[in-house]
């Protein structure tokens, strides 16, 4: 059983229940919806069909964020090296071979002579040779084609776009209305961009969690404040590989993963994980290694984009990713758990989480059970990337789905029992029924003062068979009085 989570991009053109069910049973944990390519009606159809398949699949919706795109063209335009092109910021005017219009009116103000403007994910490069008021003059640097509504990147330049477009705001309200689990905000440059989304959520009393997509140099430079302001991070390597030197991507990816682990924040590695499988039934060896290396770096989750949104082999892509993940995890676990320094030496929850993980290695404990109001203890445990799963007992469906982005966490909904004893034994029964544990196995139980707000206060280790033999008549340790806030 894999412990790395899988996010699948889904198009409203292919989102029927049978298709989504196949992806779910192949290993999909989260459905991602890209608002750049789907209408509100299409988004609602994906949501409805996903919830028909399972209430346990998390839903994530993208914003467009502060991006620049070209306007429409009648047909793809062919450019040769040396062609001269004028560029204007006229979002309502179509583009031609001689004049390319872009969606940002002040584009010419923010771009300088000597800058490279990259179109269509870097497929077409134009060098700015002249700037005259609202007009830029560019020279084509490589042969290529330019179609409608293609991405525009200017590496190294700060484009003064607002954090949210009007379409973004409408889609955030749609996410609130539909009770989506995550919003993935695109092109995040600083904590201020995250807070712009959070402000709207707060105004509507929404508990949707924000995933910040790191796609440019500013996002990399400000990563620490962005992590602090976000629920989690997505390393979106497509635009990132255009905005920064491509040879730096592996180092940036590893650094961001490490920072997220230290902050106990979920992290997703995305873009071209199995790109070949859009058209082919098998991946390249390089793609297999890319997935494995992301897992060796201890990512929480991996994302499929075109592979599941429009590819010919979507189910096979998920199955392939799941197999690679499971094999890489088994290899990674031979090296022991991740050493995560305590950020607060007086934090009881951190100390007990580390002790529980160490018990899985030193005492042969086969799993950890914890109950959770918000998922924080489960995320603390996930940060260590232990060899055995964490069973998180959640009292809210939403918390269960939030944990679909946390490594090694099996989140299950369970109604609230009257005592720790009842909750623990019910969890043991469920684990046995699902085949996760046997009577001879040891299990760790991490919990606290029963009820809301008690915090994590004790760690108990029991042999499964002994618990059942006593017919559940065992006593958990006295709960420690603590001033710590609950999760």
Annotate each PLM feature:
Residues 1-487:
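Non-catalytic helical/linker scaffolds that mediate oligomerization, partner binding
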